[in-house]
């Protein structure tokens, strides 16, 4: 596992026809060794608390960045 990978959430204001503007959260894997984002999933959720819980869990269990999208999909299916 790579202890230097940190999962972060990034808020972004988006627009969708029929909905209007809304805030959603992207989740990214930041590699401290490379000083760069190595994986990102856009527009994961509009629920800030859920995005925080996801990042906390990914950091706690040191999720590999290659599994980020799959882990997010699995967590969203469980809601």
Model-derived features: positions:
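Detector for methionine-enriched segments
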Residues: 1, 9-10, 54-57, 75
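Short, mixed-charge low-complexity intrinsically disordered segments
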Residues: 61-79
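A short, exposed loop/beta-hairpin motif centered on an aromatic-Gly-Thr core
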Residues: 35-53, 57-59
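Short N-terminal "domain-start" leader segments
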Residues: 1-28
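Phox homology (PX) phosphoinositide-binding domain
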Residues: 2-4, 31, 48, 58-61, ...
């Amino acid at each position: 596992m790579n202890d230097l990978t940190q999962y972060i959430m990034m808020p972004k204001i988006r627009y969708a026809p029929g909905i209007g503007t809304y805030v959603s959260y992207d989740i990214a894997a930041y590699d401290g060794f490379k000083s760069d984002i190595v994986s990102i999933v856009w527009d994961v959720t509009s629920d800030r608390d859920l995005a925080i819980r996801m990042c906390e869990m990914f950091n706690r269990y040191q999720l590999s960045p290659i599994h980020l999208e799959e882990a997010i999909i699995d967590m969203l299916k469980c809601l």
